[in-house]
């Protein structure tokens, strides 16, 4: 690993591990030190960290003192999903208790040898420790090696106001297959206490800032605003068709909302509208009529919260830094397709991605409608994959027909071995709704 990418500009840190089960026991301390020394010997120009799970670290000590937990602990340590279970436990603990735990003598005892061995102390879901440890060890450097996406406002404030904290890694930037269900909103009344647990047919984690089709979810805009990279506000609404329904919760789940105001059949249903901004106040308008002003931060950091009865039209927010709007779309009658590129290099190794969104007759995106889309590829290219970002569904990404999710599907097209022409056709309701020409050269 080190020799392969030695001195590569994108490599800033090496890690001796992430959520290692034995991190809090003597053998784990010893192995970590050996790995740190080996990495320093192989590459003295880069720093080394270890992403520590607090619950895994103290489990060794808790097991020594609490005999009746031994079998459950051993099972978790031997289970392939041991770290996932410990993360679920951490997610369920009240934040105040979690912060107290992050600064506890028990955790100090468990991970001090790890912290002393590495160049940068990496903490998973231990926000309070980022600043706490600086008092005892002002020379240490800290990174948030894994953190909840919902807590980025707090975390980035820590980064900006503490020079020893060099940054933050969220779990996670891009959605992924596996750990199915940790970020999915389960509305089934029998599953409200599931928290972390996934249920068939859950397939994705669904905790990414960006979904599987490359579409930015609302929490990504919260992050962009927290970073200071976006000044204008961002507006989104809780799915109106889910308004009033309870779902399971954990801190990987932000809000089940979309940048959309299209919910035919739900007129009059009250839903929650969120405005993300660093400005002190936001004013909301529906079809030009003011719905009032709200202070930012009263309910959530960097957020103004409104309760709004759904009516079709235009929902607009205005702050001192700008405005944002969402417009009700009409019936989904077509597709708007875009390709990441349309010229591929021959040899079977080049790929382009085509996204297709449902649109009405005026070109407005319809995120509510569901349509079956078929992908047909002809010519000197291969349909490498096709599907939606639906986190809970059946089907394979090798299938050529998928239902849209939040109004979108995506295709991955790989170049053929020889130069030539190719064409991707997307068919909806039995009619070709979009054609993407591709050149392989």
Where are these regions (language model features)?
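Short, solvent-exposed loop/turn segments enriched in Ser/Thr/Gly
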Residues: 348-354, 420
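Beta-strand signatures of extracellular beta-sandwich domains
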Residues: 281-285, 372-376, 425
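Short, hydrophobic beta-strand segments
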Residues: 305-310, 398-417
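Active-site groove signature of glycoside hydrolases
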Residues: 2-26, 110-113
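Short aromatic-acidic-glycine turn motif
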Residues: 294, 334-336, 376-392
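Short beta-strand elements
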Residues: 322-331, 431-441
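Substrate-binding clefts and catalytic carboxylate motifs of secreted carbohydrate-active enzymes
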Residues: 14, 37-41, 48-349, 361-366
């Amino acid at each position: 690993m080190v020799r392969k990418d030695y001195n590569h500009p994108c490599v800033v840190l090496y890690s001796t591990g992430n959520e290692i089960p034995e991190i809090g026991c003597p053998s784990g301390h010893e192995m970590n030190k050996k790995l740190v020394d080996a990495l320093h010997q192989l590459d003295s120009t880069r720093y080394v960290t270890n992403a520590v799970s607090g619950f895994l670290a103290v489990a060794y000590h808790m097991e020594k003192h609490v005999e009746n937990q031994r079998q459950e602990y051993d099972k978790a340590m031997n289970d392939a999903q041991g770290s996932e279970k410990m993360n679920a436990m951490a997610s369920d603990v009240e934040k105040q208790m979690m912060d107290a735990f992050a600064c506890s003598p028990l955790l100090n005892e468990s991970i001090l040898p790890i912290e002393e061995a590495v160049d940068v102390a990496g903490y998973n879901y231990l926000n309070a420790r980022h600043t706490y440890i600086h008092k005892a060890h002002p020379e240490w450097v800290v990174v948030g090696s894994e953190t909840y996406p919902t807590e980025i406002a707090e975390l980035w404030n820590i980064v900006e106001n503490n020079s020893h904290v060099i940054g933050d890694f969220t779990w996670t930037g891009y959605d992924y297959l596996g750990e199915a269900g940790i970020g999915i909103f389960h509305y089934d009344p029998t599953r409200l206490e599931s928290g972390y647990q996934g249920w068939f047919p859950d397939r994705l984690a669904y905790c990414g800032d960006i979904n599987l089709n490359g579409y930015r979810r609302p929490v990504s805009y919260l992050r962009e605003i927290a970073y200071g990279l976006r000044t204008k506000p961002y507006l989104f609404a809780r799915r109106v068709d889910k308004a009033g329904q309870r779902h399971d919760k954990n801190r990987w789940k932000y809000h089940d909302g979309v940048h959309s105001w299209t919910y035919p059949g739900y007129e009059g249903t009250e839903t929650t509208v969120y405005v993300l901004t660093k400005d002190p106040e936001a004013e909301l308008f529906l079809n030009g009529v003011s719905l009032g002003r709200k202070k930012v931060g009263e309910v959530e950091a960097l957020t103004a919260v409104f309760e709004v009865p759904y009516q079709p039209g235009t929902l607009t927010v205005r702050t001192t830094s700008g405005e944002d709007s969402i417009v009700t779309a009409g019936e989904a009658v077509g597709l708007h397709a875009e390709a990441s590129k349309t010229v591929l290099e021959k040899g079977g190794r080049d790929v382009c991605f085509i996204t297709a969104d449902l649109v009405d007759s005026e070109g407005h995106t319809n995120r509510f409608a569901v349509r079956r889309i078929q992908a047909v590829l002809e010519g000197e290219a291969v349909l490498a994959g096709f599907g939606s970002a639906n986190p809970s569904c059946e089907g394979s990404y090798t299938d050529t027909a998928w239902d849209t999710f939040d109004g979108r599907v995506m295709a991955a097209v790989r170049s053929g071995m020889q130069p030539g022409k190719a064409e991707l056709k997307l068919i909806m309701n039995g009619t070709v709704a979009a054609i993407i020409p591709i050149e392989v050269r």
